[in-house]
Amino acid sequence: MQKRAIYPGTFDPITNGHIDIVTRATQMFDHVILAIAASPSKKPMFTLEERVALTQQATAHLGNVEVVGFSDLMANFARNQHATVLIRGLRAVADFEYEMQLAHMNRHLMPELESVFLMPSKEWSFISSSLVKEVARHQGDVTHFLPENVHQALVAKLA
């Protein structure tokens, strides 16, 4: 039986830090579902459809990745996808407390769902979508932090 994992997030937009995590996850699991949350409360810059399309393009080189949008409760989504592993990236100690709370709640809702925490490579450890957007809004060069297609879309969105 295949080991299916979900890597959820808002990915507004997906960064090279996210690509780093999902690339390493593909080496650990047979099938990785990159699950893009609708997250209307976060008021994303890109629509869910745009985020899905950008992420599909940015991960096209990864053969065992499926990109899908979702708006369901994570535990329900994982159950429907027959996934038993939830991948989460941890950049800093500050991320840990929140992620621990999520992991405990997800385990309560779906006991067979295991949370696996991956640290990004040092090069990406300080990057977040929010930070990249903020720097780009002020005409800072964020080319290094985004896949090329995502960088082009961000520049167009801010124009």
From Swiss-Prot:
Binding residue positions for ATP: 10-11, 18, 89-91, 99, 124-130
CDD domains named in the record: PPAT (cd02163)
Residues the UniProt record annotates as site (Transition state stabilizer): 18
Enzymatic reactions: (R)-4'-phosphopantetheine + ATP + H(+) = 3'-dephospho-CoA + diphosphate
Sequence positions that bind substrate: 10, 42, 74, 88
Keyword rRNA-binding applies: no
UniProt GO BP: coenzyme A biosynthetic process
Subcellular location: Cytoplasm
MF terms in GO: ATP binding; pantetheine-phosphate adenylyltransferase activity
Pathway connected to this protein: Cofactor biosynthesis; coenzyme A biosynthesis; CoA from (R)-pantothenate: step 4/5
Keyword Disulfide bond: no
Cofactor: Mg(2+)
E.C. number(s) listed in UniProt: 2.7.7.3
GO terms under cellular component: cytoplasm
Alphabetized UniProt keyword annotations: ATP-binding, Coenzyme A biosynthesis, Cytoplasm, Magnesium, Nucleotide-binding, Nucleotidyltransferase, Transferase
Complex and partners: Homohexamer.
Biological role: Reversibly transfers an adenylyl group from ATP to 4'-phosphopantetheine, yielding dephospho-CoA (dPCoA) and pyrophosphate.
Family in the record: Belongs to the bacterial CoaD family.
Name of the molecule in the record: Phosphopantetheine adenylyltransferase
Provenance organism: Shigella sonnei (strain Ss046)
